[in-house]
Amino acid sequence: GDGVADINIYELVKFHKSHKKAITVTSSQPDGRFGALEISQDNQVLNFKEKPKGDGSWINAGFFVCEPKVFDYIGDGDDVVFEQEPLMNLASDGEIFTYKHHGFWMPMDTLRDKNKLNQLWIDKQAKWRIWDK
């Protein structure tokens, strides 16, 4: 799957250059997929939040700015998964910063995601369509 966002690429690259590391990963805090219950110790429902903003975690939004030395972390072969060993080793070596994106971001991993994004486009609510502004 892929993600769709209204990331300011110029600001992302500027951020990357200012930190002088091998890679900058864009992060986002996606909305939760389900309603959340706040429950007391005796199981009484105290509050209900419809699809709250995630759990506060920042996730990999899938947009990267890389320096050539990133290739030194990628092994040979077709079985390399970039988000696993290469990124973990870059993080261990202190070579990753994150650009925290506070704007629109949505994955397109499922048919449900695709349909929602298509509907946003049809309704002219596609926040990633920045070239018409």
Q: What is each of the regions a protein language model found here?
A:
Residues 40:
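Short, acidic, Ser/Thr-enriched surface-loop or helix-capping motifs
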Residues 4, 10-17, 30-31, 44-133:
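Catalytic-core segments of class I nucleotidyltransferases/pyrophosphorylases
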Residues 19-29:
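A short, conserved acidic/glycine-rich loop-to-beta-strand motif
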